[in-house]
Amino acid sequence: MYAGKMGKTVSVKKYKNREKQTMKKTTEFTPTAFILGILLAVVFGGANAYLGLRVGMTVSASIPAAVISMGIVRLLLKRDSILENNMVQTIGSAGESLAAGAIFTLPALFMWAKEHGTAMPSFFTIAMLAISGGLLGVLFMVPLRHALIVEEHDRLPYPEGTACSKVLLAGEEGGAKAKKVLKGLLAAAVYKFLADGLKLFPSEVDFESRKLRGAGFGIDVLPALVGVGYICGARVSSYLLSGAVLGWLVLMPAFVLVGGDNILFPATRAIGTLTTWELWGNYIRYIGAGAVAAGGIISLVKTLPLIVTTFRKAVRGYGNTGRERTERDIPMRYVIIGIVAILLFLCVMPQIRLSVPMALFIAVFGFFFATVSTRMVGLVGSSNNPVSGMAIATLLLASFVLKLTGQTGLKGMTVAISMGTVICIVAAMAGDTSQDLKTGFIVGATPWKQQVGELIGAVVSGLAIGGVLYLLQAAWSFGDPELPAPQATLMKLVVEGVMGDYLPWGLILIGVFIAVAVEIVGIPVLPFSIGLYLPIHLSTAIMVGGLLRAFYERKKNEAYVQDGILFSSGLIAGEGLIGILLAVTAVLGVSAKFDLSGRGISLGAAGSLAAFLSLLVIMICVIKKQEKMEIDS
């Protein structure tokens, strides 16, 4: 029935037979699954939004959502349902993927409003753009499911989806595993409050070289970055750090060495007088932007043959499924009605009011990039999904079209970012939906129920993300050091460059050719380019997490590796949640009451490094202790 080794086919049938037996005693879409899924969607959506706005990266929430669900359903509610837990993680993980798409673009609208002195985008506008992209992402994925999830079961592993199914099938360990996530959450929450709430020590440590003028080095001692590095692994982390080393330890000193007393646009002072951060902001950031743009487009071009194959199989395979519960998707007529209704809504939505051609642009490129995303995550996982590349390609094309039709200035840029937002979220949601449907396929879930769960998660998460963005903007400001929003800043630069023709194109083209060179030598271009674009402080901390995982992988102890992933998921969620709570205190005007640095109490850089090392020790001890307890039991 499926291509590939018979062993794998039998394995899937075994899971489906097990599920058919349990279906006599349980259901999928319960009030518990609905409520718990919504809560997790809000939590992981908010946490990932904060993480993405701070460091420009997000991570998958499917496995931690499944683990927490099993812990609650099994330990507190005293029942065990694999399908109910699968529905919880399906709804809950929607928040992370929608946040990943939203933070890439939407903050640009706030930054333009601040720069031009116009009204901030309304909560309604932000939420509706997010919800529209989320719903379209799920609906575009529906006709692709049978071709990619079923027919190519053995050729497309969908790493996160398969891993999540293993967690669900090992449900008896749910309580113990949930504790690992919660311990990571607690550790990060306490750490984050000490660093950025009480300001007992700075969360960033800088080092400058006296002998190599212009060079800079540092580390952001943040729990979430360690978690990201551990989840990504040493290889991806090393690509990020390599790009950062090129920017901060090679290119920046080269600018100072060659530039000297010269003034080079966009800086307004002599290069030799600029600080490391000014060198990065005036030069390296634009070089990195060119590299990221080129890397994203290169990644898309490489997937074109796969896209054509996927589209053909989707058209041929949709509707050929049987009447069995595990083969039913949302009916195609409802999918089409939903897509048309959303596009019409975007045409009449206040503040945006897309033209019909622009709505059709979203439909065509939205489905195209949904196909790209779905196929890509099946091969390399959601963490390597080139969403930023898709967003850049969309913004470039949309901006050129709008400029040719006379829609320029702030209005034209707003429309371009709005279109980019929807398509970016479409790509992120389609990738997440495919991972969840892969999990459901293995454990024997009902596809149409999972798809409805994703739609619910998209609506709830869209409302939550709108609230989180407004809260963070009110507390700080997008583009400021506390909330740099690196990806949205990049998208803003892309649109401004096309509309205004005042970007330093020479620097951007240098970045483009760096990306081409990196691709030629066989290094994954996107993570390298992102490392070049982001400050080295982020990549350094991420590398620490990657090295810790590499240590356990060398010991060939998969249990340690998985325990670390769960703890790391908790670190990311804990820091994100405390970051949002600190934003609330800033809006209420009470954050200064917690600030000990204002009273002369601060441990300085030494305290930062000591706290960071303590966090690593805690992480190692928790992983080993948990594993020892499980072995003893």
Each language-model region and where it sits:
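Accessible peptide chain termini
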Residues: 1-2, 23
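Alpha-helical multipass membrane-protein architecture
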Residues: 13-633
